[in-house]
Amino acid sequence: MYTNLPKACLTGIVLTISTHSGPQVVYHYPPVKQPVEARRGRKVDSRNERVRSWQAGRMPSAASGAVDAVGEGVDGLEEESSESELDRSSGLSESEVSTDWADYSMSSSDSESEMREDGGGESSAVGGSSAAEGGEESLAEGADSSIAWPGPSESYNQLLESQSMVGSSANVAAASTKPKSIKSRHSQISANKLFQYLTNTSDADSRRQSVFSKLTGNEDSETIRLTDSVNLLDLESLLEDLEPGLADVDISELLDVEVFQPGRFQDVSKIFNFDAEFVAELCSPPKEMCNTRFELTVDDLCFLGLPIHVDESGRWRKQKVKRQQTNTRSKRSSSGGKPDAGSRTSVGLPHGTQERQPSTDQSGSGAPYLAQSSSESGQLRDPEQSDDVEDLQKAVHMFHVCFIMNPQLVEYNERIDDMYHYIVTRLSLILRYIQDKKGYVVRECAKILKTRDRILKKSLKLKKSHGQALQGRYLYECILKSSSLARALTKCFNSIINNEIVTLDIDNHKVISLQIPIKNEFSSLPDLKINPVLRGSYLTSLLNDSFLKQPVDFAAGSMMPGGDVMHDDNDVLDYALLLLDDTPKIIKDLEFSSFGSDLANVIMINLVKNLKPTVSLRSYLPLVSNLLEANLSLSARAAGSRHAASNAADSHSTPLQHSMIRSIVLHLVYWRYARIILPLSSKNTYIVSPLAPIRGTAADDFENTDMVKQGCKALIYQHQDLFHEKFPTLPTLPSFLSSISTCKPRSFGHLIPSKDHNLLYLSVLAWLIRYGYLTQLLTFVWLRVDRRIKIAVDEDLEREGVRTWNSIVKKEHRQNPHDNVAAPTREPASSAIDETASSSEHGDANISDGQESLDDYLFKESDYTIILEPKTATALEKRWLFKCIENQPTEMQLLFRKVIKYFNGKTPLELVEIKENIPKQELKKLIACLDKYVVELKHW
């Protein structure tokens, strides 16, 4: 179990929708056979053996027709060799597979007649996913004659015709084209399916045509004419008929070439050896189980998602009740446009959007948005097509983006929870929002279904392609060119499996960034043999994750009644920010992932340009104030108001600037652009990190790959080239690290030859920390009180006549069983124990007195006591602490009272210097004055 390594465990992504005619798999990626061949080799062998034998024509596969629909509420006729093999291929037995959702289509009979007239060379579509599956299999058969395609026997066809249930199956072809060896020998049907056939007495002609059949089967045969030669205009004509400009869409970076290799590619009608109909029904829970977490495990795969269902009024999301604008709000809105200081400012967040003006129609259904969104996108030019998509908008009542994962059992909960929290919920909710506003999801599903049907039936290039892998790749290229939603899902999958951040532009309406945060910082040294980490991880007590997990009040600054900001002891503004990449590249990414016209984005980009790791973030408050002042001045000039200009002049150092900088910093840290560190200084001490990337050939190479066999350099030598390119005048990287790694750690300033080299060496220091080679050695302090201080305080209390020392100790020791002091360091004498034991013989009245005297003795006889939290110390403990500094100079006593709360072993002194603006020499003098009362610890 490697929980410290980033691993999404994602194997596929499936988009399903559900209508009155049943669920439908609209799109899935990648179309591969086995997701985890290397780790589950035992199961892969048997499955691959069945696939290879099926492709060679030696035996029909039971999985090919496990859950295929054959018309009106009937599963397809399988060519199965045994019942157990069927269970392994589909995940459910025949009796457990529901057929209530089957698509009742009238276009199937016409398609079958066309197929028979053409001699089995083509295959038509059925409503639902079987349309695409049937078309592709028949086309592949015409292209590759070496593959034997199983089909039902004639007796079963006669049975279907007698029951008026003639339909087009995904694996049905003309009998003349089938090999004689499998023409009718292996065509079998279970008793359960036969009972379903015989009991279904409904006439197919009485069924109303489904939305999918109208959408995919209502094609004009003269729109695209097939030619005798293959040319590039085939794809362009098909796509231009859907929407202008689709043929020019670049998808070169989306499709993985290895997915469409003959050894890995699987039929598009299959999803990891499961039939598409089975997965569609699996991912379509009832309404009561929608709009909440969906998690279902089948075999070794986990289906995770958030199915979105319409409510009773037909809306995809609840509408917020608009409050009437009161006079108070109107006055505040017209007072110069100054934002409320108490509100949290959202700066460059992943959900930041620039929306178009929504429709004012609030009739309660998603249909009013269809006409507007359709006219804006320009994709529905044909009135008949517009009617079909409008019918689909009204018919679809659920959509589900389901993520298929295969985590190990020992890390199942962690991987599943991370995927659901960071990816599934955010993507599903943003799709629900855009579907409710503009009908985007259903509109894109209509594009995918129409493109798939046209390509399978009318594409000459697809028919001329040899092999299922080439045909599947061509089909996916067409789908990705036609649908922006398919491109977004594919891009999301490719980025997540590579542990990258993905930025999706949803219908030019919303920009969303998704990622699963990686674990690359540790406060304690992990066991690398049991649980390895990424090469170059950061080893420090200042964890960036602690800032991201802070509540909103601490992140944005807690507000006091007077309107001032009450800073937390661990305020992020006291730290510096170290960029993890080159500044131009970060700015380019920020401009791409957000809207450039946003004021927050402008401030963030200007802040990134001026960031230095040697300066605390609080120093950039004037920069933010100047940018806000310039913006308010422009607004005042445009509005012709002097009141806004006066507000701009008084905008320095307000809570708004503090909140904006905090939000920008947390944004940059969360999206891996920067790290929060203490400001770099030549007076600080830095050491070579135990997690420095010395070994391995890559960041995730935790197995120490043999570099000779792989022909790769070690990480340190790869970084050596970068180091020499950036700092050509300095020694090599190993030599520089050896000069830092000395027996006794020294300040970094000992390496700087002169003041002229200060900036250069600080740049080197920032580079080494960025790549994980160095970590800062921090100083932590506790205060300890010895026996002499306790006796002196006891004498003072007796002279003051407050109370006896024993009574104070007894009360505080009883009330604080888990007190603020460390455990005593010496055991009591045996004589005291014997004395206490003998006193218990005089009766119950003396038991309590004996226990009190024992407690007093234990407390007085301890050599010293360490105060763990001076900030929350009791009155007696504070007397002890101030007694330690009593005979020191007045300035030292004042400094001690100022910094005593930081002597808790948790706050480094290097941070205290910045927070309280105290010189390092003054702190050293104070530590020297305290002398034996200080416990000092050097740690990262």
Swiss-Prot record:
Record key words, sorted: Meiosis, Signal
Region (Disordered): 37-155, 317-387, 812-848
Listed InterPro entries: HTH_NPRL3, Npr3
Signal peptide per UniProt: 1-21
UniProt keyword Signal present: yes
Annotated Low complexity bias: 61-72, 123-133
Acidic residues: compositionally biased ranges: 75-84
Gene Ontology CC: GATOR1 complex
Disulfide bonds: none
A biological process from GO: meiotic cell cycle
Function of the protein: Mediates inactivation of the TORC1 complex in response to amino acid starvation. Required for meiotic nuclear division.
Protein name, as recorded: Nitrogen permease regulator 3
Organism the protein comes from: Eremothecium gossypii (strain ATCC 10895 / CBS 109.51 / FGSC 9923 / NRRL Y-1056) (Yeast)
Organism taxonomic ancestry: Eukaryota, Fungi, Dikarya, Ascomycota, Saccharomycotina
The gene coding this protein: NPR3
